[in-house]
Amino acid sequence: MRKEKSLGLAAEMRKLAEASREAARALSHADPRRKDAALRAAAEAIGRREKRILSENARDVAAARAAGQNAAYLDRLRLDPKRLAGIGAALHEIAGLRDPVGEVTASWRRPNGLEIRKVRIPLGVVLMVYEARPNVTVDAAALCLKSGNAAILRPGSDALRSSLALAAAFAEGLEKAGLPAASAQVVPTPDREATYELLALDDLIDLAIPRGGPSLIRAVAARSRVPVLKHYQGVCHLYLDASAPPQQAVDLALNGKVQRPGVCNATECLLVHRGAAGKLLPPVGRALADAGVELRCDPTALTILKRAGVAAVPARPDDFGKEFLDKILAVRVVADLDGALDHIARYGSLHTEAIVTRDLASARRFQREVDASAVMVNASTRFNDGGELGLGAEIGISTTKLHAFGPMGLAELTTQKFLVEGEGHVR
């Protein structure tokens, strides 16, 4: 029985992917105005279908609550009229972005007269695997459509009802614009095997992008025959150099940790130069503790903070290199910039690293030697975001160096091909 079920599911997923492949062919040369019209029509459809979408979302939330999911998880899953309006606004924003397809990124003429251009083209079919965030269903579908890609959307089972309801509204927009319905498809079953069947279809799917916790990303990477671009964990460090201005150190530490502690570009570890730790740690630690942050410190940092009357606890060995996604911060005193670079090289996740310093030489060295998708000088780790960097909306922040590194906007959902024009040239 299980084998028959598996064969049936495999055939169903292949049929779904084949439909996406056909849609991708049409989207690769679709009129940009038609794509934008679909996005705007989808936004209007979400508004009209609000009652239905919220009803399905309420069922998802109730089931997740009954399954014992925590408050933060339920908050990510929950939709309300304001959040739905935000999803609609995001569709209008994406419609207003510049279409990357067909952009000429370079051109030159060879001595033999050949005219050569490099132009952006869609990737093809993108499989998005993500956890219980219904908004990702629409964001991913919209970004893929705008960049000429077909999207296969695999939400976590807890968000399946919400995602199907949102996808129905998106399909209405596609239909009104005369684009293929298979341009954006939600996998209609919660069966985990469906994901693995899709990940085996490297003849039909061009890229898989997992967004979620480490276990999800490891599972996708281990089982996939399709190239995987990982939106992995953000173990982001803030290093306070010897010359760091105290108030700036306080401001950046607070913003990085407290503004939204549950996101991937939140600061997870504070490193402080030994020569300035006595001056910097007490005000920074006090501000963080007053904001409700639990400080998990190495022995040196713990001694300094305790002496200053700041609440702190000893760090466990595994606190360094951990993505807390909560009001928890690992704190370590390092000997100098070399010590900070060594720590980041060992514990960083290639996401975002930041330094606070007045020393230009230290700043430039930090930029050169730190391996991360974004390196901040006197700016919060929270700025590693497509919108904040001026890229527009993003599908995720890649910690994989191939094919994109950092926030993935529309351009990162394309590749490039060469267009070569001659006059009967032979080699």
From Swiss-Prot:
Pathway assignment: Amino-acid biosynthesis; L-proline biosynthesis; L-glutamate 5-semialdehyde from L-glutamate: step 2/2
Location in the cell: Cytoplasm
Gene Ontology BP term (one): L-proline biosynthetic process
Enzyme category, top tier: oxidoreductase
Species assigned in the record: Anaeromyxobacter dehalogenans (strain 2CP-1 / ATCC BAA-258)
Gene Ontology molecular functions: glutamate-5-semialdehyde dehydrogenase activity; NADP binding
This protein's UniProt keywords: Amino-acid biosynthesis, Cytoplasm, NADP, Oxidoreductase, Proline biosynthesis
Functional note: Catalyzes the NADPH-dependent reduction of L-glutamate 5-phosphate into L-glutamate 5-semialdehyde and phosphate. The product spontaneously undergoes cyclization to form 1-pyrroline-5-carboxylate.
Catalysed reactions, semicolon-separated: L-glutamate 5-semialdehyde + phosphate + NADP(+) = L-glutamyl 5-phosphate + NADPH + H(+)
Main location: cytoplasm
CDD domains: ALDH_F18-19_ProA-GPR
Name of protein: Gamma-glutamyl phosphate reductase
